[in-house]
Amino acid sequence: MIDKLKKSVSKIRRAERSRFKLKKSGSRPRLVFNKSNKYLSCQIVDDIQGVTLAYATTSEKTFSSEGKSKKDVGAAKVLGKLIAERGSQKGVKQVMLDRSGMIFHGRIAAFAEGAREAGLEF
């Protein structure tokens, strides 16, 4: 049985490995997705200049999702649309998705689907 420490260390290593590969290619900004116990957040980061181009989270007062929860699949899809709109205002159309070591399923898949529907390409 895998204990919690080994599982979290494996996740961190996966995230660092994939983040290194994304930074190495470096032609497009990264779309970073993160989930906490209460909220979801994302940001578009330009690694060459070292700046955050756009940021969105479900803890914002202006955020409104279809459901009551701010961390479910519906909220993730709305968050994807919101970050795509903010990115397009800054002139960002193509990004690379940084999943932070998480598998592409559930909230991350819904987030990516919402961002693609709103015009981001990755």
Swiss-Prot record:
Gene Ontology BP, a term: translation
A GO molecular-function annotation: 5S rRNA binding
One GO CC term, this protein: cytosolic large ribosomal subunit
Pfam families named among the record's database cross-references: Ribosomal_L18p
InterPro entries: Ribosomal_uL18_bac-type, Ribosomal_uL18_bac/euk
Keywords of this entry: Ribonucleoprotein, Ribosomal protein, RNA-binding, rRNA-binding
Sequence similarity: Belongs to the universal ribosomal protein uL18 family.
NCBIfam families, sorted: L18_bact
Function description: This is one of the proteins that bind and probably mediate the attachment of the 5S RNA into the large ribosomal subunit, where it forms part of the central protuberance.
Subunit (UniProt): Part of the 50S ribosomal subunit; part of the 5S rRNA/L5/L18/L25 subcomplex. Contacts the 5S and 23S rRNAs.
The name this protein goes by in its record: Large ribosomal subunit protein uL18
Protein's organism: Leptospira borgpetersenii serovar Hardjo-bovis (strain JB197)
The organism's taxonomic lineage, starting at the top: Bacteria, Pseudomonadati, Spirochaetota, Spirochaetia, Leptospirales
